[in-house]
């Protein structure tokens, strides 16, 4: 607009001789001011690749296991095939009495559930389990156990263990379900006698000072390498009867269930986890 006006002024001066001489000082001043304004107008900065490059903190180096099932260098090994030193009775804290043989341990139903000595918050968990080939029973009374991802004062969040190979039951109680909350996305069960794997990412809930929920617990789980729980928000601790609900807690142990059904007991091996930072 400024230059258009200047052009008009110049044209007027040129075609009006009596104004030409008197307008020259003003025109010179306008040209100087316009040139200065153009020179001082900042050139818009262009984005550079370096603007979005993050260099620190540098991720820690972790040496992976020989296979995806083997513990990486930063893993906490909970069962290495030798003993149950990392576990105690959930009933009274005494040494775990489940049977260890040939690199495997098997549920001892009379002695009850076992839990880890240590407590954890957020983690990546690897568990291998097997329903015996000669398993009998049906529905929930067939190879039943459970991995409680956090166990607090008699309550916990259960990832179901069950023979779900040609065994009909309610879908939020089959293998790889978040028990009584979320059915698995698919049934990835191998037949009895074959080893199953669970790989789980557990994000613990957090609580406000008054005990209310600040953030929900979240679970992502793979059964035999197949995604079965996709970052689901848990509704609370597992309830066999009634609706799930939250109770405030901090770090908690992991529990393995000795289910009271009469079927042949489940076995476990190769259990490890990696502790994860807060979200």
Feature-to-residue mapping (PLM):
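Short linear/disordered segments characteristic of secreted peptide precursors
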Residues: 8-9, 38
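Hydrophobic residues within membrane-embedded alpha helices
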Residues: 9, 19-22, 33, 43, ...
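Bacterial N-terminal signal peptides that target proteins for export
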Residues: 12-28
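Hydrophobic h-region of N-terminal signal peptides that target proteins for export
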Residues: 30-39
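Carbohydrate-interacting regions of secretory-pathway proteins
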Residues: 40-279
């Amino acid at each position: 607009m400024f230059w258009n006006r200047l052009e008009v002024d110049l044209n007027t001066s040129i075609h009006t001789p009596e104004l030409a001489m008197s307008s020259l000082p003003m025109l010179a001043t306008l040209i100087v001011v316009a040139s200065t304004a153009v020179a001082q107008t900042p050139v818009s900065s262009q984005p550079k690749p370096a603007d979005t490059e993050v260099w620190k903190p540098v991720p820690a180096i972790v040496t992976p296991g020989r296979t995806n099932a083997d513990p990486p260098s930063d893993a906490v090994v909970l069962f290495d095939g030798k003993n149950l030193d990392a576990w105690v009775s959930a009933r009274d804290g005494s040494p775990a009495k489940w049977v260890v043989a040939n690199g495997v341990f098997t549920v001892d139903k009379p002695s009850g559930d076992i839990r880890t000595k240590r407590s954890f918050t957020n983690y990546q968990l690897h568990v291998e389990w097997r329903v015996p080939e000669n398993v009998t029973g049906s529905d929930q009374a067939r190879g039943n156990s459970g991995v409680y991802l956090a166990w607090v004062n008699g309550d916990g969040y259960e990832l179901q263990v069950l023979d779900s190979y040609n065994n009909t039951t309610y879908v939020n109680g089959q293998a790889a379900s978040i028990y009584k909350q979320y059915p698995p996305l698919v049934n990835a069960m191998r037949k009895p006698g074959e080893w199953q794997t669970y790989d789980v990412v557990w994000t613990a809930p957090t609580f406000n000072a008054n005990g209310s929920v600040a953030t929900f617990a979240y679970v992502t789980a793979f059964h035999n390498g197949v995604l079965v729980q996709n970052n689901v928000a848990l509704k609370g601790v597992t309830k066999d009867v009634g609706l799930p609900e939250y109770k405030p807690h901090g770090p908690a142990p992991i529990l393995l269930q000795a289910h009271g059904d009469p079927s042949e007991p489940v076995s476990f091996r190769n259990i490890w986890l990696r502790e994860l930072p807060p979200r």
